[in-house]
Amino acid sequence: MAESCEALGTVPEHERILQEIESTDTACVGPTLRSVYDDQPNAHKKFMEKLDACIRNHDKEIEKMCNFHHQGFVDAITELLKVRADAEKLKVTDTNRRFQDAGKEVIIQTEDIIRCRIQQRNITTVVEKLQLCLPVLEMYSKLKEQMSMKRYYSALKTMEQLENVYFPRVSQYRFCQLMMETLPKLREDMMNYCMSDLTYGLESIRKHSDKIGEAAMKQAQQQKSFSVALQKQNNMRFGKNMHVNNDRILEEKSDVIPKHALEEEAENDEEVLTVQDLVDFSPVYRCLHIYSALGDEETFENYYRKQRKKQARLVLQPQSSVHETVDGYRRYFTQIVGFFVVEDHILHVTQGLVTRVYTEELWNMALSKIIAVLRAHSSYCTDPDLVLELKNLIVIFADTLQGYGFPVNRLFDLLFEIRDQYNETLLKKWAGIFRDIFEEDNYSPIPIGSEEEYKVVISRFPFQDPDLEKQSFPKKFPMSQSVPLIYIQVKEFIYASLKFSESLHRSSTEIDDMLRKSTNLLLTRILSSCLLNLIRKPHIGLTELVQIIINTTHLEQACKYLEDFITNITNISQETVHTTRLYGLSTFKDARHAAEGEIYTKLNQKIDEFVQLADYDWTMAESDGRASGYLMDLINFLRSIFQVFTHLPGKVAQTACMSACQHLSTSLMQMLLDSELKQISMGAVQQFNLDVIQCELFASSEPVPGFQGDTLQLAFIDLRQLLDLFMVWDWSTYLADYGQPASKYLRVNPHAALTLLEKMKDTSKKNNIFAQFRKNDRDRQKLIETVVRQLRGLVTGMSQHT
């Protein structure tokens, strides 16, 4: 449109110029022609075209004219030819030549001008294009420099500017196309390097996880130490008001608390490094920014989470020897804490890379694995100190992660499982302690030679006896050395159990209940078992058993002081809160019963040993007139033993004495009726009667006080009536009154009488070969045979009745 308008504007001008050329003298044509070249750059071409058109018009007119004047032209030509030789001389020819020469210079100058104008225009265009391209080249050079310096985020921003701002301006140039083709490759290189950098950064984070966790756990422990120190100081003030018999060990342990608190406060002053101080997160941030700028955050998030989950699995997999030392558990916990502290840091400093839902899912997965690992490896721990240190680590571990918002209730539930295991290890340890105490005890009353020694024992064991206090030195405590040691060790066990119950976020009531239950286990399972094993040991004699019974009595009385001791350290009132009672009463009562039974057994065994020394001449004609030596030794032994029994409770001594007499009576009866004994003379019966009389005298001498009347003598009533029957030979009375409640020989068994009578009958036959020639002997023999028949009838009747 613009060209057409321009053309319309130049037509009248060209016509004017043509008119001037046609109407102007030839010498003045130069300025007119110059005006043509001064106009538009291509105007001379159009002018030439116009000139040609004008020439053609004139040619046509000339042709018309020539056609009109053709004949005349022919004639003129003919005439001209005639004058051709002279035409060159004409001035027109010379003028035309000069005109042509002058026009050539103008044409040359015109062409030079056109060429200069084109060059000028090209230079201007080049300058403009260079000014447009230079920023692109500079930005691309800047991009290359940023890539070489690994400033990828800045390079990415530069790349965006190139694509959005600079490249559209020069998109028509080939170099721009080449640059644009390199951008995807640069992006790919950038992403690959970022991934490599991220992988290295994540590996560095993993390597520093233990230091991060150690710093976090240390910080959590320091924050907790101050409050714990204050609480312990308050407990110390309360402990100083406790009863002297209940808090001796407590006060000794409480004296350490202020120093410990000061140490904790000194540690609080130390600077704790943060996670930013320990780990360089720039690779993560850089990669996140780059992928965010690329619009591919999801790929980066998936890659990051995938890599961190792999690291989590590595962290959660402990070494096989983790259970051997506390350092193994500490490294395991610090790595886990470091891992989740990093995740929490990423959660709070980034948007969307890590979400709360993701961290909770990861924590739940990790928590299940941690619990499984701890449950498996802690089962190998047999050292209570190691289990306690493990518990402290778990508490610090849980408190640390709880401070970062992770739920840790399942860890404290696990601690209750470990607490049972800890109690089991404590019970095993204290079983060894109790065994050592019992092995080292001399089972004799504790001798006291001075007031200081008396106070030492009183400070270790709650013993109150006004009569003993009034006695002068030297004197003896009724219990042996093991009693205060056992009491102290039970309190030490309570302390050891309390150490595990601390920091479990449980109320004082729950802690009190746990202490009482664990103490009950110690008493009912361990101490009771140790006592029973001690009682059943072969080398434990009657004196030791008596002392054990006395010891258990005092330990049973001390149980109320143990209950008060637990109440004091937990600050729980038994009146306001229902508390578990200690089972010391039943524990020591069972041990006493076992010791009493063992006393009865060993006493009977000792009686059997003496009875086995008996050496009767069952065919003697007359007795020696004095009791057998073995029996007198036995009675003397029983007297000395029962003197030791004076320290026992009355019923125990009475039962032991009655049991011994009954066993002695039974043993003598069995000796008399032994089937291997075929013959017994009346002299042997008389000798045996003398021994039984000594037994009756011993029973009537009240070797143990507390028996009423002849209660103890009744133990020998069966022997006495049987021997009286044979000594008096009162068979008519026995047979006549048999079965009557008021019978004189009510305790004589027909079978026993028959057995003994048959032994005596055989002796009579053997010793009285000529008895058949004496009437009295024949009558006695007939009486024996008659009595034997009647006794056999009674025995048969008893069997049928049964």
Swiss-Prot record:
Any single GO CC term annotated in Swiss-Prot or TrEMBL for this entry: perinuclear region of cytoplasm
Naturally occurring in which organism (per UniProt): Mus musculus (Mouse)
Known function: Component of the exocyst complex involved in the docking of exocytic vesicles with fusion sites on the plasma membrane. Together with RAB11A, RAB3IP, RAB8A, PARD3, PRKCI, ANXA2, CDC42 and DNMBP promotes transcytosis of PODXL to the apical membrane initiation sites (AMIS), apical surface formation and lumenogenesis.
Pfam families: EXOC6_Sec15_N (PF20651), Sec15_C (PF04091)
Keyword Transport set for record: yes
Protein name: Exocyst complex component 6
Matches recorded under PANTHER family: EXOCYST COMPLEX COMPONENT 6 (PTHR12702:SF2), SEC15 (PTHR12702)
Main subcellular localisation: cytoplasm
Record has Transport as a keyword: yes
Similarity-based family: Belongs to the SEC15 family.
Classification via InterPro entries: EXOC6/Sec15, EXOC6/Sec15_C, EXOC6/Sec15_C_dom1, EXOC6_Sec15_N, EXOC6PINT-1/Sec15/Tip20_C_dom2
GO biological process: erythrocyte differentiation; intracellular protein transport; membrane fission; mitotic cytokinesis; vesicle docking involved in exocytosis; vesicle tethering involved in exocytosis
Subunit comment: The exocyst complex is composed of EXOC1, EXOC2, EXOC3, EXOC4, EXOC5, EXOC6, EXOC7 and EXOC8. Interacts with CNTRL. Interacts with RAB11A in a GTP-dependent manner.
Subcellular location(s) per record: Cytoplasm; Cytoplasm, Perinuclear region; Cell projection, Growth cone; Midbody, Midbody ring
Key words, A-Z: Cell projection, Cytoplasm, Exocytosis, Protein transport, Transport
